[in-house]
Curated annotation (Swiss-Prot):
Source species, domain of life: Bacteria
Its biological purpose: One of two assembly initiator proteins, it binds directly to the 5'-end of the 23S rRNA, where it nucleates assembly of the 50S subunit. One of the proteins that surrounds the polypeptide exit tunnel on the outside of the subunit.
Protein name per the record: Large ribosomal subunit protein uL24
A Gene Ontology biological process term: translation
Organism: Bacteroides fragilis (strain ATCC 25285 / DSM 2151 / CCUG 4856 / JCM 11019 / LMG 10263 / NCTC 9343 / Onslow / VPI 2553 / EN-2)
SUBUNIT field: Part of the 50S ribosomal subunit.
SMART domains attached to this UniProt entry: KOW
NCBIfam families (UniProt xref): rplX_bact
Region annotated Disordered, chain positions: 69-106
Keyword Metal-binding appears in the UniProt entry: no
GO cellular component assignments: ribonucleoprotein complex; ribosome
Molecular-function GO term, any one: structural constituent of ribosome
Entry keyword set: Ribonucleoprotein, Ribosomal protein, RNA-binding, rRNA-binding
Pfam families found in the cross-reference section: KOW (PF00467), ribosomal_L24 (PF17136)
């Protein structure tokens, strides 16, 4: 499996699927599955039984994982979707950068 181009906390653009064109922040990356959970994207309805946290139970909306091939990081400079490159910084660490603007992605 190749390296993942997104990390937790990244702002990503959805380039395919029902939520195409939307952006959101990555909440969790499921490495083995090659999927990510993105805030406000791919919402599903789940039925829950009454419990201490939710005494009434009922239907709850929550994010479902989306495949990482359908996500692109957002360029910090332009605010548009971009591809990611990797290069060695002056300190000797590997950093991710935007292919469009050359800006480092934190």
């Amino acid at each position: 499996m190749s390296k993942l181009h997104i990390k937790k906390g990244d702002t990503v653009y959805v380039n395919a699927g029902e939520d195409k064109g939307k952006t959101g922040r990555v909440l969790k990356v499921l490495v083995k599955e090659g999927r990510a959970i993105v805030e406000g994207i791919n919402m599903v309805s789940k039925s829950t039984k009454p419990n201490a946290k939710n005494p009434q139970g009922g239907i709850v909306k929550q994010e479902a994982p989306i495949h990482i091939s359908n996500l692109n990081p957002v360029d910090p400079k332009t605010g548009k979707a971009t591809r990611v490159g990797r290069k060695v910084s002056s300190e000797g660490t590997l950093v991710r950068y935007s292919k469009k603007s050359g800006e480092e992605i934190k």
